[in-house]
Amino acid sequence: MLMPLSFSLQTKEELARVKARHPCCRQAELVAFLRLGNLDGGQPGEETVLFTTPYPALARKVYSLAREFLACPVKVRNSRRQGKGRPVFRVVARARLKEIQDWLAGRAGVPEYPCCQAAYMRGAFLVTGSVNKPSGTHHLELIFPDAAMAGQMQGLMQQQELEPRLSRRQRGYVLYLKDSEQIIRALSLMGAYSAVLAYENVLIFKDMRNRVNRLVNCETANLTKTVETGLRQAENIRYLIATVGWDYLPPALREIAAVRLQHPEASLKELGEMLHPPVGKSGVNHRLRRLELIARQVRGQGREGYAPDDDLSRPRA
């Protein structure tokens, strides 16, 4: 049973099928393959293993580029260890190791043009790179055998408005990106557009989920505040009824007090719609604040401290 490919391998499968438009870009990609792919000249006769990989798409890509730019016959060999496991593909050139090294020496440094730089970065990523799935920890990295090559790539990436960090590890020098926008830019530069879409879809989903959570939290906070306020107002109303008496309150205050006692969780708008005739939020708020003020006055001075205002008047017959 075949195991599903990881996001990193899916990205490499996609990049292995990208063909640069210009010959200079294709050559830059081949240079990255040969520099980082562990050339092996210990073959019988005048042969050099240019590249070894278990992935056929990548072997085909290196084979195609080598045939285009190397002035020697190139072929692909595959083998299985004792007939088991995945096949290993070797791209072999009929040329001595020194000839290949001389060809590389004539193309030292990093490419000059942005399109060639992107192709070179794609080749390097296909050989030594990896990228985490977008739903996990954001991380893209490239591994180099020495500080000089890592420094060259770091400079190239900086020219492409990327800011990779450099770290020394046991397996070599690692350039890595942690920022999701930087990773998306790197994938886009290399031509991994399906991977970019996958990344952006996950980021959009995360953003929408965060927005929903913020709205829910805000609504919850508002609801909690409304309920707490309603309970406090209901407690003040019960205190007034117990001290100054229900009939001692003006009719407008008696009406809102009765509704608030029945619905301590209701909002100002909902309370206003329960009155006859309905009253707006500001009117409801004014009456409730008036009740709270009366409750404070009575608590401070007793029943004698409460004198109904003319605008709300004394109880009417």
From Swiss-Prot:
GO terms for MF: DNA binding
DNA-binding region (UniProt annotation): 267-300
InterPro entries: Homing_endonucl (IPR027434), Sporu_reg_WhiA_N_dom (IPR018478), Sporulation_regulator_WhiA (IPR003802), Sporulation_regulator_WhiA_C (IPR023054), WhiA_LAGLIDADG_dom (IPR039518)
Top-rank taxon, per record: Bacteria
KW Cytoplasm (keyword) present: no
Pfam families with a match to the protein in the record: HTH_WhiA, LAGLIDADG_WhiA, WhiA_N
GO biological process: cell division; regulation of sporulation
Gene3D superfamilies named in the record: Homing endonucleases
Biological role: Involved in cell division and chromosome segregation.
Assigned protein family: Belongs to the WhiA family.
HAMAP family from the UniProt entry: HTH_type_WhiA
Name recorded for this polypeptide: Probable cell division protein WhiA
Organism: Moorella thermoacetica (strain ATCC 39073 / JCM 9320)
Annotated gene: whiA
